[in-house]
Design a protein with these regions (language model features):
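N-terminal loops that bind phosphate or other acidic moieties
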Residues: 7-362
């Protein structure tokens, strides 16, 4: 749909009756919830003397950072805390969620890169064992449907650790459970575009390790293919999370979906915005990659009869954003402000409020 004329029949500035705020996190600075709350504060300050609009804030995630919080906030689920192992087999406390009969799992809760000190990161040793423990905990509680966010892993073990932690129960889980993977990664398991070559260097692997990890993944895929009679190692997303994508696709017949789109569907986003007249989304930095399936672009695809603003920490390619259909493109960070200053949470919070007030004054 051509959105360029949609905004002409909606008023600018104040006068909005219902506003939906659904921003991704400003990574390394503010969570999705904190960004949303800052925008809401700016809206409320401007409308203080008028009839305040209804404001609905929706925590967002693309399947990585913040996915668990986003689902539980939107769908009012239960938070479950367990003891499990991290990627170096150290005992930690980790959380997952249960919404109705579905478990919401972030692999980063157990196999997360952020849990491992930089000097200890080693994907040759890192294991997804703790993820297997978490899935088993939910399974024993009666959960049979799983949504798994694949972002932020420290591992490159193709899910072998997860499968070992399940023991023979992986066969029952395969028969009885369904898995949906939240990930925007489309890489295969092996080769120059695979898990080892593309992602392992970010997890501490040197060139020799990368080759060894790729060889290990290839051998595991060959053995698995002989066992099942089919091979998912080339499937889009098999290379996600150090090959965990492959393990779920090959062993549990998982369905892989873009994380942002999955969240929007699960929370009923289309119904929520039906009677809204303004949607505000954003992220830490918006550029042409934003239009390649990142959260703001996914939200843009759902917006038809509403205005939509893109409110991000930084913005490149502003014209491309406007041409794509955003009615306003707002950079909250002043041009002259150094990045290290702008990344301070309190500074970013205040920048957002000021930028929103200025937009409503237009």
């Amino acid at each position: 749909m051509d959105r360029k004329n949609v905004g002409l029949r909606l008023m600018d500035g104040a006068g909005y009756k219902k506003i939906i705020i659904a921003c991704d996190s400003y990574k390394g600075c503010l969570s999705s919830r904190e960004v949303n709350e800052a925008i809401a504060s700016g809206v409320k300050e401007w409308n203080a003397d008028d009839a305040s609009p209804e404001i609905i804030t929706l925590e967002m995630s693309d399947g990585g950072e913040g996915m668990l919080d986003a689902f539980l906030s939107a769908m009012k689920g239960e938070r479950v805390r367990i003891h499990a192992h991290d990627a170096l087999m150290r005992w930690i406390e980790a959380e997952y969620g249960i919404v109705n009969d579905t478990a919401i799992i972030e692999i980063a809760q157990t196999a997360g890169l952020a849990l491992i000190e930089p000097e200890q990161r080693n994907p040759m040793k890192a294991t997804s064992w703790g993820l297997g423990e978490m899935i088993m905990n939910a399974y024993r509680r009666g959960v049979r449907r799983f949504i798994v966010g694949l972002g932020g892993s420290a591992t490159s073990d193709c899910g072998i650790g997860m499968l070992k932690a399940m023991g023979d129960d992986w066969k029952k889980i395969r028969r009885e459970c369904s898995f949906v993977l939240a990930s925007d990664v489309t890489n295969p398991l092996c080769g120059e575009n695979g898990a080892a070559y593309v992602f392992a260097p970010q997890k501490g692997a040197d060139a020799k390790m990368v080759q060894m990890l790729d060889d290990r993944a290839r051998k595991f895929a060959e053995v698995s293919a002989k066992h099942f009679g089919y091979d998912r190692s080339e499937a889009p997303g098999a290379g996600a999370a150090g090959g965990l994508g492959y393990a779920f696709l090959q062993y549990f017949n998982a369905e892989a979906r873009p994380g942002a789109e999955l969240l929007l569907d699960e929370i009923g986003f289309d119904a929520l915005i039906l009677d809204a007249d303004l949607v505000i989304t954003g992220e830490g930095h918006s550029d042409r990659q934003t239009l390649m399936g990142k959260l703001p672009q996914r939200i843009l695809e759902h917006v038809t009869n509403q205005k939509i603003w893109l409110v991000s920490g930084g913005v490149s390619d502003r014209k491309a954003m406007l041409d794509a259909g955003f009615d306003r493109v707002v950079q909250v960070t002043p041009e002259e402000m150094p990045l290290d200053e702008a990344m301070k949470p309190e500074v970013a919070h205040n920048n957002i409020i000021k930028a929103i007030r200025e937009q409503f004054a237009l």
